[in-house]
Amino acid sequence: QFQRYLSGLIISENKTVEGINKLFVIESRNQSSLNRLLTASPFSEEALNQQRLALLNSLSGTQVKPKGVLSVDDTLLTHYGRHFDEIAYLRDTVNGGYKWAHNLVNLHYSDDQTDYPLHFRLWRPADLDKIEQGLQALGIPLREGKFALKESNPKKWRQYLLGVWSRNQGKPGVAALYQSKLWIARDMLQTWVNQDPEWKLPVTFDSWYTQPAFCRFLDKELGLPYVGTLTSNDQVTLPEGRVTLEQFANELKQKHLDTVASGGKPILHKIGIPYKGEKETYYSYCRTHRIHNYGKQRLVINFNESDLCDSPSFYNSNRLIWQSVGITRIRRHRW
């Protein structure tokens, strides 16, 4: 039955139990047999995943390599109905709008030969009643004036309650009340380090996961290098004061264009990185700066076009001697 299910996931457009079962017309069985595999069979998903990873690591094309990269992200699994456990009405940042979906958090492995997930876990919507009761039981006070928001503005109540949870999540018992996507990512990375301590692969992620506490966890607790993604509103500290990265990039761009026009040495340098057998070109600035809330970081600002007419990308890393080529190559492996 497991072979039938796996084959169906690979080749069937309809990945329901009924749809997969209908594929097997020669050796047909009642779909209840396949359903029992998923609902009543005692197999361990974690043990199955470890066997999958062991198989991948036994093959030269898919084994973990010294230049491999780990990336953290989450994926929406869209549904066209609402009657599913753990489903939520979530914003689709790729296609826009909101959709009913499950949200799968992924720890992914990538190198120039292969890509595959290492670990994955379903994010579950916050149980606000559980969090409220749990915080009070742990002696963490909730402001009396906020309780009216339950009826008048449920969205603000949710934001307030999760804010209290977030600020206190380092205290005993608080983290267990709710597993945010960041906490799931932390747990998967901790599992990876525990299972494969010899590997110190860099971790990369988008701007949603680039948060100070998560970066400190990777640096101080796991000892892993990381490449994050900053936004144009993040701030860099310069001798003359703190400015946004957008302002800083605009200043660099103008200085670069003026210098090049007068025959001087360019401020942004042309770099090339290998990716999946191809070579990609960027125009890059790389220096160590103090980034607000992150401390001292290696900052990379990349443009795609030689005339710098496009919007720049901003990357940060805890490896202060790394150069823009290495940082950009690592970030490129976030699929």
Regions found by a protein language model. Name each.
Residues 54-59, 171-201:
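Short, basic/hydrophobic alpha-helical segments
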Residues 20-21, 66-80, 107, 202-209, ...:
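Short, conserved catalytic/metal-binding motifs centered on acidic residues
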Residues 6, 39-151, 274, 289:
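Active-site-proximal, Lys/Arg-enriched surface segment
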Residues 113-170, 174, 178, 227, ...:
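An anionic, glycine-rich sequence signature occurring as long contiguous blocks
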